[in-house]
Amino acid sequence: MTPDEEHSIICHLDKLLEERSMSLVDLSHHVGISVANLSILKNNRARAVRFTTLTALCRVLDCTPGDIFTYKDEGKDS
């Protein structure tokens, strides 16, 4: 397996938005990021995240980066 296949970062925006009764469009307005880019992030297709984006998400969602993202090492036995 390549390093990209052995692990992944999982985005939990869906769960956080649901818990806050907030839509992706609402979040987009609050953080100043397009719905398209938030959708890429939400669907685990983002290759990188800027610290300014992460800071804005944490501020608006009142959470930490660890609430938004978790690391899953798919190469290890669970």
Segments and roles (model prediction):
Residues 45-56:
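Short, basic-rich loop-to-helix N-cap that marks the start of a DNA-contacting helix
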Residues 1-22:
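A short, Lys/Arg-rich alpha-helix, primarily the initiator
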Residues 2-3, 20, 40, 69-78:
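Short, charged recognition helix plus adjacent turn
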Residues 37-40, 53, 67:
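Residue-level recognition of specific faces of alpha-helices
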Residues 21-40:
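Short alpha-helical DNA-recognition segment
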Residues 14, 25, 55:
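Residues within the helices of the helix-turn-helix
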Residues 17, 28, 58:
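The alpha-helix within a helix-turn-helix
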